């Protein structure tokens, strides 16, 4: 860790004689001009502004003219014919293919959010580089679906050959609704079954069958790979490393023993694991195959008396080989997973398969092989045996279909993992403190810095911290209107210069050997408008409300989502993304099963030891974006009562980086909210100024 320059951070002094309107401009970080907010404890704040009725998500004001994104889409000029689409469509009539439409998802064979460059097929065919989206190509049309985080980015990146489908907006069809509408009845829709989860493939199959369409599994070739040809990047081949026990907190033998107990309880003889972070966590291994995520491409099958890791053995170092042997794990070639599934089925193995993550190629291979096994044993029943889990869901033939037990175990951090997360966050905070000092000095000295320049400099500061490995996602460095693109990625030669007269949003994170960070701050290097301050303050109020939430055990995350939106809702504003996601310990920056979101389907309870982000925001299209993000971990809290005999939970902060207070409209804050901000900044000074 690096100590901070003595002039960069100064202790706070809370003086009770100062009022809210008369507060000292001490600075926690000179780069942000961050004054503590003082108040007279005898005075209460009240809302004093009269608000006009909002129009949709954007309230009219004299300084901002925001156009709907659909208008920008209509005004796109016609591009030259898309040669990639032409080449792809030529393959539709190839023998053994014979399809009318082809679907290209974002995922790899493991349903990863971040994927190796060689698997970025949807980005290659469409030009849209956001992490979430699905492309559908027919013989005469091409459409791309993405969610609200990426509407503006997709508008910029898609050519006129593509139709942008804004998922979630009123009147926008789903992929299968669109296919049912544009294809003549009896069409054939092709997919690469390795790139769809079993659940997703079954849903698609059932939906298009309503118009008598057939879902065609193209096992032997991916059509995008065919046209990508030699220019397609090579698969990653970097070495795997052992994740030290002092960071993991639990050895592999203990984790496998617990998993095997789950197999016994489920009536299963083996489990197939395809999620890369689950494999890395279970085996205490880390890799470098996927950008920003310390994982390696592999499958894992755990049986009652053995385990098999399907991986490119050129990545396996002698240390890793010894580590695996000691845990009783054998190596198999990565591409032999289907043959192993067939072999286990031929023995009548009852496999545990998570249909939400295991790909359709594996699932379909298992089902076909089990049918053969039953036939060879003269068991020709019209309906094969099904196992049902505790939720009443049924699985495939002789299989146990339910959520992987590893996801929940991984989400509940042990003491060593929490310690590593806290330590890495303090080192990260020290790097950010130095970065913000540098950035404000540069801006005030008139330097012309692009959004990429800023992101690169932040990486430079972080890389000097001990244990630094990589960024945990592409840094979102957005000035002005670019900040409204929720997952904006600045590109060299195409990005903006950081404007001192506009809001600047910086969402970034890092991978350290002992932890994973994710933090967003929004700042202004000049004088913010009243509108910007109001929006920022309401986002801050939502952030504070969630941070202070106390809730009974077994509460799912969606119950808390409204805490973060309430202040925005009061004036008719909102944001189009979830409020919180799980975060891995030295693993993926986004992990499940927990979340805090307006989507009601996730009933996973928040449990002591889980980590979630707290990141409300507000975005005015083509104007500005605001987001404030800390990471929190769930802890038990003492309450004077325990209604129903249950424990109550709350949050503890992992992130300690100042929040720019000149963006705060004091008239909107309560005394308690002011206290929270002052206390938080006191903690920042106390913890980060001592970092080494």
Predicted regions and their residues:
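Active-site neighborhoods and metal-handling regions in enzymes and metal-associated proteins
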Residues: 2-692
